[in-house]
Amino acid sequence: MIDAKSEHKIAPWKIEEVNALKELLKSTSIIALIDMMEVPAVQLQEIRDKIRDQMTLKMSRNTLMKRAIEEVAEETGNPEFAKLADYLDKGAAIIATEMNPFKLFKTLDESKSPAPVKGGATAPCDIEVKAGSTGMPPGPFLSELKAVGIPAAIDKGKIGIKEDKVVIKEGEVVSQKLAVVLSALGIKPVTVGLNVLGVYEDGVIYTESELRIDEEEFIGKIQKAYTSAFNLSVNAVIPTSATVETIVQKAFNDAKAVSVESAFVTDKTADAILGKAYAQMIAVAGLASDDALDEELKEKISSGAAAPVEEAPVEEKKEEKKEEAAPAAGLGMLF
């Protein structure tokens, strides 16, 4: 905090700026520090227009932002907030918003735009010039293309590039001449935008590496975790609002299977038990000699006839709900 003794030594505009920054820092629950040092003025204005309704962006000197952060941390008794000042770097600015850190990062990332590479900068990737017409009339630009190693000639009254050409490799320094030519050709190999330095929320500071996630992979992991939890709940018979219906249905089907296998007759399993017994009878009869069989059995064996086996009734769920409320009383009570 600026004390009375030192206040007169500090320029009034600095005091006002720190107070304005403090007010901004206290205005929302999410505070981010961003790097905007390499963002050209035109792109910066475009970005500000895109995010204006979702967040407040304020630029200031790093020293003043540091002081404001530390004073807010002291005034609110929140030492964790003071650590945000450690992320101040380069041409930093403050963003105040109620948007959660991951959505904020995605919004800023999507607001980035392509831009020409500057002379003296490092090539972010291999930069290739494609063959074809430049649309420019004959003139000095032809010599400029050749000067940076791009094969060019006049074609149908326009300057044309003869073949595809990689003019610089990733990591190499771009010369001023090449930067001018690439810009004239409309080649924008650089992506510019607001880069996240740190985002504060509820005592936690997130960095870019933590906020950059693969959404499809993340959703896939959540779906896999849900499926595993669902299966565990069903197999361990731990009812939840999401699994109780499946658990009851599984218990019903298991009980029905036991009833059929043990020939425990109920109104729901009688047809299945009789059908199974009939099929077994036909199978055994098929092993016997013809002398031991009457004509009816012989006919059924020769035609492959078998009694129909009852399929699971469609209205099982209704039965399950009725039985769920009833006390357990042996297999018969489940049907």
UniProtKB/Swiss-Prot annotation:
It comes from the Archaea. This is Large ribosomal subunit protein uL10. Part of the 50S ribosomal subunit. Forms part of the ribosomal stalk which helps the ribosome interact with GTP-bound translation factors. Forms a heptameric L10(L12)2(L12)2(L12)2 complex, where L10 forms an elongated spine to which the L12 dimers bind in a sequential fashion. Belongs to the universal ribosomal protein uL10 family. Forms part of the ribosomal stalk, playing a central role in the interaction of the ribosome with GTP-bound translation factors. Keywords: Ribonucleoprotein, Ribosomal protein, RNA-binding, rRNA-binding. It comes from Methanococcus maripaludis (strain C6 / ATCC BAA-1332). PANTHER family: 60S ACIDIC RIBOSOMAL PROTEIN P0, LARGE RIBOSOMAL SUBUNIT PROTEIN UL10. The keyword Chaperone does not apply. GO terms for molecular function: large ribosomal subunit rRNA binding; structural constituent of ribosome.
